[in-house]
Every structure is written in structure tokens, then in C-alpha cells.
A protein has these predicted regions:
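Conserved glycine-rich cofactor-binding loop
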Residues: 39, 46-47
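Rossmann-fold cofactor-recognition segment
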Residues: 84-104
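Substrate-binding pocket helix/loop in short-chain dehydrogenase/reductase
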Residues: 134-135, 139-144
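Active-site helix of classical SDR
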Residues: 158, 194
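Residue(s) in the substrate-gating loop at a strand-loop-helix junction
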Residues: 178
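SDR active-site lid
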Residues: 207-280
Length: 313
């Protein structure tokens, strides 16, 4: 009796894997077909996630409007999208200079975006500015810059395209946020504050525009690349104890841009309102923040205290 089971089990595993693969391919194909002809705005399109999204939505037949701060990089992305594309199946992307650190230009940017096709079906707010430093070393000017890029910029752009979505009673606004929009860790005060603000804004927006058939989604992910957190001038990297360092490393253990881009596509097509894309440790930390905050606070504070003692030795 054991022999048939040993033979059948691998076959069942292979069949199950095959069915799972086919299912994923069908879902992926359907996801791409659902964005065909849709006007999609992607901010910071030249970043890793932005580029992956651009390729994914372009292959799906979306009418892309790509925003970024560097025109040469935007043109390079344009070339990579159109070089091997079938003009019968895809649309040439529109390029727009979009710099959230220049809030005075936002009104003109919104006008330029709307002039491309007259409307926006999907707005993907992907821009982000990161910083890792002790609170006392961060200037108020830096705080404002981070708030501009991470909060005021996305909210201003969302407000700009909102009237056309309301008039059409259709549209989707998606914020690519961070897990730190829901859970703050030491030495990232400005970044976490801006992400919390963005999370709150889009949560409010979701409730206010649902009656118009507009979907608002937020994706809270761990960092794409934890090695790119600039320190304040002259400040050494803060040290933490083992437990706090482990939690921080898990919170900043990034996902691949391609994985996040696929999650964005699925979120759009399934009209999910909130997605957490994180490893188990950040998820546990979120639960602790809600159900046992004193323990989480103690762990984070112990890490900070340990770093101070280490620097004094």
C-alpha cells in the first residue's frame, strides 16, 4: 500500500503546481486586459517600482502618463517601453515633469496631466523621500521637504484629478505608501510622520468619494531598498540592540519592485482598498501596536537606550 502512495504523491504535487501556475497565468492575463485603454498616471516613473509598473501597464494596453523629475530618464524609459512594443496593441506614453518638492508647480502639472487625455482613470502615487537620522539632527526645512514629497505632493495631485473623476463617477486613486505609515520606528521620525499623514488623508478620501464610484487604495510595504536611507550631515548611523535591530531590519527588508508592481496591478483590478505587503515580523509588530503597545514601545525604547549607551562608551 505504501508504494502507490509514494508514486501518487509526487504526481499530485506536480498536478497541483501545474494548476496553480495556470491559474496565476490566467489571472495575470485578465489583469492586464482590464487596464486596456485606461488612462494611468504613474508618479516617480523612473524609480524601480515606477519602471516596473510602467512596463506592466504598458504591456496591458494602458494609456500611460509618466511623471518624474529628470527628463532624460523619462525619455530613456519611453524608449525602453516603445522599442519592442506593438503600436497596434500599445500606446506611446506621455511624459510630464513632476516634482513634488516644488509645490508651486502642482497646479500647472495637474493641467498638463489632464490635457493629455482629458481625464484620468487611475492615479498611482508612487513618489517617496526617505531619511534615517535622530530627531534632534533633522532640520525643520528637511521635515518640510519630506512632507512635500510624501504627503502634500500626492494629496495635491489627488485633489487635482478628483473633479474629473467625480464628474465621470469613475476612477481609482492608489497610494504606494509604507509600513511606516502604520508603524513608526526610531530614527525615521520625519519619514514615518509623512507616511502616517498620507495614510490618514487617503483613508479619509476613500470614505468621502465612495458614493461617486471612485476607489481609493493604499499599499503598505516594507522598503524597496533599505540601503538608501541618507543620514543627516555629520551624523553616524545609530546603533541598536540585537532585538531592536532585528525588528528594524525586518521592517526595512524590502520587497522586489517587480513583486510590488504585480501587487499594484492586482489591487487595481480587484479594487482592494488596503493591502499590507510585508514579512511576518512587521505584521506581528502591527498587531502588538494595536493589542499590546507597551511591549512594543519597551522594545523600541530599549533599542534607542542601548544605542545611546554604546555611543557614550
Amino acid at each position: 500500500m505504501a508504494l502507490p502512495f509514494v508514486v501518487v504523491l509526487p504526481l499530485l504535487i506536480v498536478v497541483a503546481a501545474g494548476v496553480y501556475y495556470i491559474y496565476n497565468e490566467v489571472i495575470r492575463f485578465m489583469s492586464k486586459s482590464l487596464v486596456r485603454n485606461k488612462v494611468v498616471v504613474i508618479t516617480d516613473a523612473v524609480s524601480g517600482v515606477g519602471t516596473e509598473c510602467a512596463h506592466l501597464f504598458h504591456k496591458g494596453g494602458a494609456r500611460l502618463i509618466l511623471g518624474g523629475t529628470n527628463w532624460d530618464k523619462l525619455e530613456s524609459l519611453y524608449d525602453s517601453l516603445t522599442s519592442d512594443a506593438d503600436p497596434r496593441e500599445t500606446f506611446a506614453p506621455k511624459l510630464v515633469i513632476l516634482d513634488f518638492s516644488d509645490m508651486d508647480s502642482m497646479e500647472d502639472v495637474v493641467s498638463e496631466v489632464l490635457e493629455c487625455y482629458g481625464c484620468v482613470d487611475l492615479l498611482i502615487c508612487n513618489s517617496s523621500m526617505k531619511l534615517k537620522a535622530p530627531i534632534q539632527s533633522v532640520s525643520l526645512e528637511m521635515d518640510r521637504n519630506i512632507m512635500d514629497v510624501n504627503y502634500f505632493g500626492p494629496s495635491a495631485l489627488a485633489k487635482g484629478v478628483l473633479p474629473t473623476m467625480i464628474s465621470r463617477r469613475s476612477g481609482h486613486i492608489l497610494l504606494v505608501n509604507s509600513i511606516q505609515g502604520r508603524l513608526a520606528v526610531p530614527f525615521r521620525s520625519s519619514y514615518a510622520a509623512s507616511k502616517h499623514a498620507a495614510q490618514a488623508f487617503f483613508d479619509c478620501l476613500r470614505a468621502e468619494v465612495e458614493e461617486y464610484g471612485i476607489v481609493v487604495s493604499t499599499i503598505s510595504h516594507t522598503f524597496i531598498d533599505a540601503s538608501h536611507h541618507p543620514l543627516a550631515a555629520g551624523e553616524p548611523a545609530p546603533k541598536t540592540n540585537a532585538l531592536a535591530a532585528f525588528i528594524a531590519s525586518q521592517l526595512t527588508h524590502g520587497v522586489r519592485p517587480s513583486v510590488l508592481a504585480n501587487e499594484i496591478l492586482q489591487t487595481v483590478n480587484r479594487k482592494r482598498k488596503e493591502v499590507v505587503l510585508a514579512h511576518p515580523i512587521p505584521r506581528v509588530a502591527l498587531c502588538l501596536r494595536s493589542f499590546c503597545p507597551p511591549f512594543l514601545f519597551a522594545v523600541l525604547a530599549a533599542g534607542v537606550k542601548d544605542s545611546v549607551l554604546t555611543e557614550q562608551m
